[in-house]
Amino acid sequence: MTTLRLLISDSYDPWFNLAVEEYIFRQMPATQRVLFLWRNADTVVIGRAQNPWKECNTRRMEEDNVRLARRSSGGGAVFHDLGNTCFTFMAGKPEYDKTISTHIVLAALNSLGVMADASGRNDLVVKTPDGDRKVSGSAYRETKDRGFHHGTLLLNADLSRLANYLNPDKKKLAAKGITSVRSRVANLTELLPGITHEQVCQAVTEAFFAHYGERIDAEVISPDKTPDLPNFTETFARQSSWEWNFGQAPAFSHLLDERFTWGGVELHFDVEKGVITRAQAFTDSLNPAPLEALAGRLQGCQYRADKLQETCEALIATFPEQESELRELANWVAGAVR
């Protein structure tokens, strides 16, 4: 009986695809070797321990209908669109070895006519007259008895959009320079004009089969067709939840300040697991009572624009004479945390 499993997703939903990855990883026998091929529509994917409010321009993402998805592996934030082909290799220990999966991807690229090399811990690069250029990045996760290696291959990704949705580390940009970061990335279409997602998936699949000396039929999956995934809805609900994608952020503090015609306002938040654990409000308004009441009500509130706006506007019933000020405050707070 084969120990291989091949899954190909027909869905572009990042929450679905990452939920499938998580489910298969948890449920597979430790003797199984899995290849999962997928791609996401416009999404910022962040590492397991990252803070989306720090890493991402969440307001612009909301305006452009770009999703946020937290993965279960570490590492940094990346932008996915349909110009990326994503792969995940899973295996039980001691067989799990990321050098094997890296070898399979390199063999797939070689079969397409692209000579690439592994560089550092996470990247695959091609040599060009302008120097090495990255065509693939990876991340990894291991538990006691299994591990996975997942990554992307840049086919025809819109590289310019990365800067639209990520808030770069100013120190990192100052050290590397924006042009050097941009220039070291390449799409495979620059090397192989016309290359498609389907061709890349086929090449990776054939390299996977060749390495293990077995062939199996692919399981094509989508939200309407999830073979052998009992109780998958629970995993999907977690992966798509605000509590996972935003609420799993490390604890942080946020200071908001603004001057209105009726007075200056400072709001100090301490946030843990996406919930405000401590709030302080300072103002030189002639009527500070609404702000003082707001600080108490914000404690325990989720750190999300709609909830903060609702909490601010709920004060109107108590302070109807300050309705215009409170609506102005509510709109400002909601906009500041988007």
From Swiss-Prot:
In this record, what's one Pfam family? LplA-B_cat
- Top-level division of the source organism's lineage: Bacteria
Which Enzyme Commission number(s) are on file for it?
Answer: 6.3.1.20
Q: Any further remarks?
A: In the transfer reaction, the free carboxyl group of lipoic acid is attached via an amide linkage to the epsilon-amino group of a specific lysine residue of lipoyl domains of lipoate-dependent enzymes.
Family the entry assigns? Belongs to the LplA family.
Q: Spell out the PANTHER family in the cross-references.
A: LIPOATE-PROTEIN LIGASE, LIPOYLTRANSFERASE 1, MITOCHONDRIAL
Q: What protein am I looking at?
A: Lipoate-protein ligase A
Source organism per entry reads Salmonella paratyphi A (strain AKU_12601)
At the highest ranks, the source species' classification is: Bacteria, Pseudomonadati, Pseudomonadota, Gammaproteobacteria, Enterobacterales
